[in-house]
Every structure is written in C-alpha cells, then in structure tokens.
C-alpha cells in the first residue's frame, strides 16, 4: 500500500519551461516560435475571438434575442424514482427532509415533484408544486400529496423599511 510520503509523479509527466529568444542553439531563438513577421508575431496581439479581418463579425450580424427574466421562479426538481430510493414506506417527504437526504441542494424558490420513475411505497409528500401524473402515481401507491404556497421573499432591508425600522430620520440643521 502506498503512503502519501512516498507518492511520486510518473516519469516524463511534466514539461520543461520553454525559454524563448535565447539564441539559435536552443531551437527557439530569433523568432521565438512565432514564425515570421506580422500581427501575430508582435506583442499585444489582441484580436478578439470572432474577429473576421474587418468584415462585420457573425455575432454582430445576427440580431439579439431573448432574455432571462430577473424575477422568475426556479424550482428544484424531485422525481418519483428519487422518493422510491430515499424514503421508506409511511415516511413524510417535506422540503426539509428532501434537503437532509440530499435531493435538494442549493438555493431554490420551491420544490417541484415530477413523475419520472415509479413509486411503490406509501409516501406523504409536501412540496410547492407537483405534476398531475406525479399526484396520480402517489395516490395510486396509497400516499398523499400536499401542495404548500411559495413564501414571498422580501430582502431584509426592504422588509425593515416597510416595517419602519432602520430608516434614518432627516438631519436637523445646526442652529
């Protein structure tokens, strides 16, 4: 068994740093591997990706399209196969337990249940949204689905301002 203090890189698994422009004998003298003269041989060769030699580039010829709505609702997706794998019969799968078992990771506005896979166990599911097929499959297995409303998110500062807390009073002029 190998130990950490005996680990070694495989032979020839790294390259020596190229020292360019240091004489003809090195093989990388004179033009330093940049070929002859021209824009690419100069320093500051900053043509952007997509440059077409002065012709109007493709990304400027085509129109802009679409956008990402800043206030969209993003759901974490949980499938029936996930419930089958992580929960025993008679269990309750709510948002908190879904996070604990690792089915919901990261920040989402809510959890949505979809019908991919099969469910044979009686499970009670408490989520924000569920597809009709998922509801039917859970009820067929003897379980139940409860949909809870999404909590409207207010930033802390907006909530404080709305409650009248943390709002500074106007400064009084000096007498």
From Swiss-Prot:
Compositionally biased intervals (Basic residues): 12-21
Secretion signal, residue range per the UniProt entry: none
GO biological process: translation
Superkingdom, taxonomy of origin: Bacteria
Entry-linked InterPro entries: Ribosomal_uL15, Ribosomal_uL15/eL18, Ribosomal_uL15/eL18_sf, Ribosomal_uL15_bac-type, Ribosomal_uL15_CS
Keyword Ribosomal protein among UniProt keywords: yes
Compositional bias ranges of the Gly residues kind: 22-38
Disulphide linkage map: none
GO cellular component entries: cytosolic large ribosomal subunit
Region described as Disordered: spans on this chain: 1-65, 155-175
Single Gene Ontology MF annotation: rRNA binding
Keywords: Ribonucleoprotein, Ribosomal protein, RNA-binding, rRNA-binding
Residue stretches of biased makeup (Low complexity): 160-169
Matches recorded under Pfam families: Ribosomal_L27A
Family named by the database record: Belongs to the universal ribosomal protein uL15 family.
Function field: Binds to the 23S rRNA.
NCBIfam families: rplO_bact (TIGR01071)
Matching HAMAP family: Ribosomal_uL15
Subunit structure comment from the entry: Part of the 50S ribosomal subunit.
Protein name from the UniProt record: Large ribosomal subunit protein uL15
Name of the gene encoding the protein in the UniProt record: rplO
